[in-house]
């Protein structure tokens, strides 16, 4: 990818078809091998490269996985890392929505951006599941919320040179997907720290944004157990929402759920 970029700089773009790197049996699934196999570093490392040649995509379901693969193969001189669950997940995106997601890098999944009090932003298939569950609880308790999905975080970064600037989305497109001033909860497949840097354009402030992700907590756990251990379960997201909205968590969570996320109850009540 370094040589391919040099060729572009010289006006001789490479002709080789872009290469997909499929990352599956990943951090949130591979419980049998404990932390030795529970590591999202591959995607994080490639996000550190220039995004116009090093693409990192997080398909949300089978439809988006197919479209993401098609997008990679239609390009030239790039590596495309696809972080894909190996286990069945529900299809969230239809055909038209799938094409829009891959084209734009992100899309609204549920809710109304114009009237929501908080925006839940998921990066990763299992993270989207938890964000949707959190939204359901917020709506049930009278708080308008929306869920957005970021499939390709590199599209939303601050461009580091002119070539990358041609790849990232414009400010107008970004504001259309992520309205300024809206409190946001991010929940990501990766460790949160790399995404805080990549998504700096979406991070409004410490008081208006929270990031959840892989905290290096692992073990012989299933997906739900991994999400809980890393404080990425839907109830943890609700707790973040309560902090941003300035309301008591007890108005959004049952007592048993509060006890679970505080470490004093049965975690399975939020599985």
Give the positions of each predicted feature:
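Thiamine diphosphate
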Residues: 11-19, 24-44, 48-51, 55, ...
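Acidic carboxylate-rich catalytic motifs and surrounding loops in phosphoryl-/glycosyl-chemistry enzymes
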Residues: 57-63
């Amino acid at each position: 990818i370094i040589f391919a970029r040099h060729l572009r700089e010289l006006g001789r773009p490479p002709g080789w078809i872009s290469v997909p790197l499929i990352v599956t049996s990943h951090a949130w699934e591979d419980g049998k091998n404990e932390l030795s196999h529970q590591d999202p570093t591959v995607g994080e490392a490639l996000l550190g490269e220039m995004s116009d040649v090093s693409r990192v995509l997080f398909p949300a379901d089978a439809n988006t996985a197919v479209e993401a693969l098609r997008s990679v193969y239609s390009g030239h001189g790039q590596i495309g890392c696809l972080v894909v669950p190996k286990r069945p997940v529900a299809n969230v995106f239809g055909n038209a929505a799938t094409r829009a997601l891959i084209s734009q890098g992100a899309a609204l999944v549920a809710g109304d951006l114009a009237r929501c009090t908080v925006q839940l932003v998921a990066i990763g298939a299992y993270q989207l599941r938890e964000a949707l569950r959190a939204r359901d609880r917020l709506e049930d308790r009278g708080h308008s919320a929306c869920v957005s999905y970021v499939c390709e975080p590199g599209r939303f970064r601050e461009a580091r040179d002119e070539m990358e600037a041609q790849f990232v989305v414009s400010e107008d497109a970004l504001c259309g997907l992520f309205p300024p001033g809206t409190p946001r909860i991010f929940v990501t497949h990766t460790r949160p720290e790399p995404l805080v840097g990549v998504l700096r354009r979406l991070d409004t402030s410490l008081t208006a944004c929270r990031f959840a992700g892989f905290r290096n907590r692992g073990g012989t756990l299933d997906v739900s157990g991994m999400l809980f251990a890393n404080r990425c379960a839907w109830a943890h997201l609700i707790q973040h929402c309560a902090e941003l909205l300035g309301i008591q968590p007890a108005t959004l969570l049952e007592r048993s759920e509060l006890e679970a996320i505080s470490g004093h109850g049965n975690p399975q009540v939020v599985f």
